[in-house]
Amino acid sequence: MKLNPSPTPLSPADYELLADFRYALRTFAAFSESAAAELALTPQQHQTLLAIKGTRKSPSNRRGLYVGEIADRLLIRPHTAAELVGRLARLDLVSREADPEDGRRVEVVLTQKAERLLEDLSASHLEELRAMRPLLSRLLTRIGDDPA
């Protein structure tokens, strides 16, 4: 990533906005890590389950993701994603199924156990986001404000 110099000096309000936004993100991340840990999941395992369930698939009849797609969604290397999928399979949270369109490829699909865990986790995460909505809305509104 290349950093571009600011065309105008940043104001103290800009730094405050960035600090507040980073704090809100970290607060949510800490909540998420704790919620996953309560169900004996690492944050990366939780993110993987959510990616499999929540990523729009093409064609739409696909039930899972390929390992490479998981790597892309989690911003990790494919071999790291493959190891992660292996650990999730040993925990009976995912299964590997032949792609119905291309038998050489394998889709990673959630098990019923994972579906139940993910539903509980996702419900609590949505509740937390709803609780944070006023703060997030204020921060996002401030991003749209003209510099002071």
Predicted segment positions?
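Residue-level marker of regulatory loop/turn positions in helix-turn-helix DNA-binding domains and
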Residues: L10-A13, L41, P59, L110
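Charged, amphipathic alpha-helical coiled-coil/dimerization segments
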Residues: N4-P5, V85-G144
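N-terminal leader segment of winged-helix/HTH proteins
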Residues: M1-L39, L91-L93, R138
